[in-house]
Amino acid sequence: MPSPRPRRRATALPVVAAAVTLVLAGCSAGPSGTGASGASDALTTFTPAGSGSVDSITWNVFQGEPQTIDPFQSADYTPNMINSNMCETLLAQTPDFRIKPNLATSYSNPDPTTWVYRLRDDVTFWDGSPMTADDVVWSLRHNMTDKSSFYRYLYANVTSIAKTGAGEVTVRLKKPDYLFNDQLASFAGVVVQKKFYERHGNKAGTPDVGVMCTGPYKFGKWKQGQSIGVSRYGGYWNKSLPRRVKNIDFTFLTDDSAITSGLLSGQIDGTYGPPTAGLAQLKASSAGQLYSGAAPLAVTLTVANHKGAMGNADVRKALQMAIDWKGIGGQVYAGEGTPAALQTVPAVYGFAKEDLTSYAGSVRTDGLPKTDEAKKLLAGVPADVKSKQISLVVPQQAETQQLGLGVKAAADEIGLNFELEVVPATGYSNYLYDPATRGDTDLLYTQFWPSIPNPLAWLGDTAVSGGTFNQSGYSGIDELYAQAVGTKDVSARSQLVVRMEQKLHDEMNPMFPGLQLTNEVWLGSRITGAPAAFDYVYYPWAAHLGGTGK
């Protein structure tokens, strides 16, 4: 999902001039890694398996305290990092970016507009009651009809959801849709207890009420401002998950220094997304281990306004190629970011992996600035277009400010009229979602991840009319996208995805290929086993944790 905030909270720089110096010094043709870079190490899917039982651990969620743990309203790092261990989905997305059956043992597509799900008969909620088809139907319908559900838009093509047997649920669509089924591996397919939600209504997910789900860890106590506690559920159905940690306290520290100190001292046993500023200390410490894994994460710029200079394709292309993406990835993101060939990153290639990998290889870039080429491209742009001011808005945080300054330096170098606007991080999401706030802003910073490892999910959110993250209203691939979503043949669908990516790349619209990020996880010396790959937003990652014997 699009996130207005970096996955690592960073302290805003007090003096912008200091950031200018850092960016211009760091963004160079030199090595992209640094001594602190986890990205220089080989990526791994899982950390070494644990062997011992652990009574309790403390795990920090880096974006602070969630507003709710209601899975229907959870679509960001913090709530999902907690909820993924409590509430499960019909299908599951695994740490190697695959989608498989989960609470549904199987699914079938008997005709182009029908999906049938066979349910497990050994699943219970934390109160011991069995999960039934009625619970599944209620949960899917709630996602479809409740206006507060973040995932409601994914049900726009659904006409009915019905129980068609004791352990069977059937979903009927208005038209063929070969993306919908995969979406049930996100909280679009979450299953909660019907009677619990009917009893508590909109209080579900609040500190006093919590949730009632089927996952490996059950809700315990929410101490507002401090922590959320969960405990191992003894009746959990999936015996393949070791679940060697009995109790987990999720804390809400957001200050870089406090998080780093807590990790080094052992007060915090682990975290995803450790502070970039603390990576050097963490990597050099014997208090634990820093691991890196693949991630469907991109840091980039999205075109928000086609009425100004960014409406010209050559201006877009010139600016993108003038930016020192390699330098930004090495310096600003401590080597965790590498230049991306396409708007969609490899971890999301999914069913189109072979075709997209081939195409990405044909347009791969080293990420170094191509200043002379950019200037030549701009030479053919009408003067009145080239002179229009281009505005970029970024949130007031260290990494994003430095990124913005790197972009401005590139724009200045090739003669564009460029303005960088830094706004409070707490209000930045308004620029992403509110047209009135955004106004005539030309470019916006984004860190993006899709709900599932499927390129159609990425493109649907970012490059199709009505997409949550298509602020400019770009419509250039709408017809191809509709055709792809309705195409059953995987090979034909894959080729349509490549055609869309080609068009987006050729037009440099509506997102720039920016940086693809890795995922980092810090595990203190007492624990191991967590996935290193970015899968903690919908997968029960904590069930893999175990003790090291230390």
Language-model segments: which ranges?
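Extracytoplasmic/peripheral linker and loop segments enriched in polar/acidic and small residues
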Residues: 50, 419-422, 426-427, 457-525, ...
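N-terminal lobe/hinge region of extracytoplasmic solute-binding protein
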Residues: 58-110, 141, 212
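Surface-exposed binding/hinge segments that line
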Residues: 108, 116, 153-198, 221
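Gly/Pro-rich hinge or "lid" segments in bacterial periplasmic/extracellular proteins
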Residues: 186-240, 247
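Ligand-site clamp/hinge motif
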Residues: 235-281
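Periplasmic-binding protein-like
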Residues: 310-351, 402-403, 503-513
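Structural transition elements
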Residues: 338-380, 397-401
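Long beta-strand-rich cores associated with HINT superfamily self-processing modules
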Residues: 521-550
